[in-house]
From Swiss-Prot:
GO CC field: cytosol
Enzyme class, first EC level, given as a word: isomerase
Molecular function as annotated in GO: magnesium ion binding; manganese ion binding; phosphopentomutase activity
Name of the molecule in the record: Phosphopentomutase
Amino acid sequence: MKRTVILLLDSFGVGGAADADKFIGSLADGSQYDDMGSNTLGHIAEQCAKGNANEGRHGPLTIPNLNKLGFGRACAESSSTFPAGLDPLVEPIAAYGYAKEISTAKDTSSGHWEITGVPVLFDWGYFDKKQNSFPQELLDELVERADLPGYLGNCHASGTTILEDLGEEHLKTGKPIFYTSADSVFQIACHEETFGLERLYKLCELTRELVNKYNIGRVIARPFSGSASSNFMRTGNRHDYSVKPPSPTLLESMKESGGQVVSIGKISDIFAEQGITKATKANGLEALFDASLNELKQAGDQTIIFTNFVNFDADFGHRRNLPGYAAALEYFDKRLPEMLALMTEDDLLVLTADHGCDPTWKGTDHTREHIPAIFYGHAVKPGPIGLRETFADIGQSIADFHKLPALAYGKSIFS
C-alpha cells in the first residue's frame, strides 16, 4: 500500500540560490536590495545561537528531528555553512539534498506548481506601484459591479499593518481594503462580521475574473475580526483564488490514475482544486499537523497527502518575526516523531518548502533560495542527493515511486 505524505514548510528555504541577486526589492525610503545571501534556516539558526531569538523561547535552535532527517546537511551543502547550534555529526536517516528553482518568480504558486512538475516559465503580472497600485478602470469596475461604497488602501502593504492603519475606517465606511505586495496578488481585507464573509468571498470571485487580463496569480480573501486597531486579527477563513496551473501536475496524474490526493490547508486553493480528491481545512500549525496525522491513519493505497504549513511564512517570515519562526520550527520538530511512527514500510515522507522568507532579511517579501529536498522511507537510501536542478525533481520522484507516468520536468531520485 503505497502512500506519500508531503509536508511543505512554507518559506523554509536553505539559501544558496545563484540567481538571488536578480530579485530586487525596495524599501519605504526608496532604497533597493536583492536576495543574495538570504538563508532562512541558516540565519534563524545563527541568530538563535547568538541569543538574539529568546522571546518566547531560549537558546540555540533545537530541531533534532529535522536535523536527523538531513536539514542541517542540506543547508550546509546549499550555502556552504552548517546551521549554528545543530549537531553536524548526526548521520541522517533520510535522503537529503536541495533544489533550485527554474520558475521565473519566488511566489507560492510558482513553487508549488514546480514541485509538482509544472514550473512557471512565463512572467506573472504585478502591480508594481507602491501607491495607487491598481488600474483605475479595474477599481471602478469593482465598485460598480460589487455595489461598493468605495475602497481603501490601493497600495503595497503588510497585511497586519494595513489593518492597524485602515481597519477602523473600514468598520465606519464599509469600504473594503485593497492591497498588494511584491507577489502577483490582489488582496482584499474585510471584517468577517460587519462586511460579511460570504460577501467577501463573492467580491474575491469577481476580482479573480477581472484580474485575469492582468495575468495575476492569486486573489486572496483576508477576513479579520476585532473592534479597534489594537485588537484586529486575521481569522482562519483566508481563501486564495488562484489561476489554474498551465498544464497537468503530479496531483492530476495521481487522480486520473485512480488514486487519491488529499490536500490539507491551502493546497487546494493553490492548485485551484485541480487534481484534488479531498480537501481538508485546518488553521494553525497544531491543527495542520493533527489533520496530516488523521488523514494518514485513514489513507489507502495510491494516496498523496499534501499539507502546506502556511504559518511559517504568513505569521513569521513576512513579519520578520525571528523568535516566532524559531519557536514554530521547534514545535514542528517535536511533532515529527508522531508522523514517523505512523509510516509503514511502503510509505514515503517528503519534507520541503516552496521558497524562502528569511526573517532576518530586509523588507517583508519572500527571498529567492534553494529549498530542502528530503525523502524518508523504506524505499529510500539515506544519504546525500546533492543539488537538484529543479524543484520538479521532487514531483518526478513521487511519480516514479507511485509508478505514474513521467512528468514533463524533473529527474527522479530513484532513477
